[in-house]
Amino acid sequence: MRLMNRRGHAEELVQQVKTRKLYLDPELTLSTLSKAIGISEREITFILNRELHQNFYYFINSFRIEEVKAKLADPGNKHLKIISLAYESGFNSKATFNRLFKSHVGMSPSAYIKTSEYQRLVMSETFI
């Protein structure tokens, strides 16, 4: 993939990372992302800084946090530990995951689960 112009480039970058789930690789770096999608590191950095107002790690970890949230919402994952879901989502450190989750979501993963479970219960009781 090559970005021909600057218009729409942020959306294209987001789409590539999202659809290919490149963020699941805990070893993902700017260099490996660049090689995977065929855009120079310099151009990716420009897009992230100027268009999305994020640095590389914030950008990638945002996808990882959303992945964890989706996994937490899946009843089929209820038996799994939160940290297992975090590792499956590309995190490689419990401390980093907890810090970033709280920073992005505004509460700890455990508090989020309680809130999510409560919302699910309220919704299911509404439809009974």
Language-model-derived ranges and their functions:
Residues 38, 90-91:
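Central "turn" residue of the DNA-binding helix-turn-helix
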Residues 51-54, 100-112:
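A secondary-structure capping/hinge motif
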Residues 51-88, 115-128:
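Terminal helix-turn-helix DNA-binding modules in bacterial transcription factors
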Residues 1-11, 50, 54-58:
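Short, Lys/Arg-enriched, Trp-marked, Pro/Gly-tolerant hinge/linker segments that flank
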Residues 14-28, 48, 52, 69-80, ...:
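Basic, amphipathic alpha-helical hairpins
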Residues 35, 46, 50, 87-88, ...:
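Alpha-helical residues within the helix-turn-helix
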Residues 42, 94-95, 110:
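Key DNA-contact positions within bacterial/archaeal DNA-binding proteins
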